[in-house]
UniProtKB/Swiss-Prot annotation:
Protein's recorded name: UPF0335 protein Meso_3367
Single GO MF annotation: DNA binding
Similarity remark: Belongs to the UPF0335 family.
Source species: Chelativorans sp. (strain BNC1)
InterPro entries, per database record: GapR-like, GapR-like_DNA-bd
Signal peptide start-end: none
Transmembrane segments: none
Pfam families reported in the protein's UniProt record: GapR_DNA-bd (PF10073)
């Protein structure tokens, strides 16, 4: 009898935890979508003000990397461009 009660309690607790995790994920997904929409709006505003959005996206990607990583990528790119006669 005690084992049945303990098992039921454990299942109830596990179900409650699962529900809480799922609801938390759902809230975060909603926030993520809102943030994504806000970012799209900023890019649209930039485009409307004459900025090249493709270039801005490239700058944002570069700013996420540390300086050493950026320099290494640029060196490799320069090497490949030179090998192909593009510089």
């Amino acid at each position: 009898m005690v084992d049945e009660i303990t098992n039921e309690t454990a299942q109830t607790v596990a179900a409650g935890q699962l529900r809480a995790f799922i609801e938390r994920i759902e809230r975060l997904e909603e926030e993520k979508q809102t943030i994504s929409d806000d970012i799209k709006d900023v890019y649209a505003e930039m485009k409307g003000n004459g900025f090249d959005v493709k270039a801005v996206r490239a700058i944002v990607r570069l700013r996420k990397k540390d300086q050493a990583e950026r320099q290494e990528e640029e060196a490799i790119l320069d090497l490949y461009k030179a090998a192909l006669g593009m510089v």
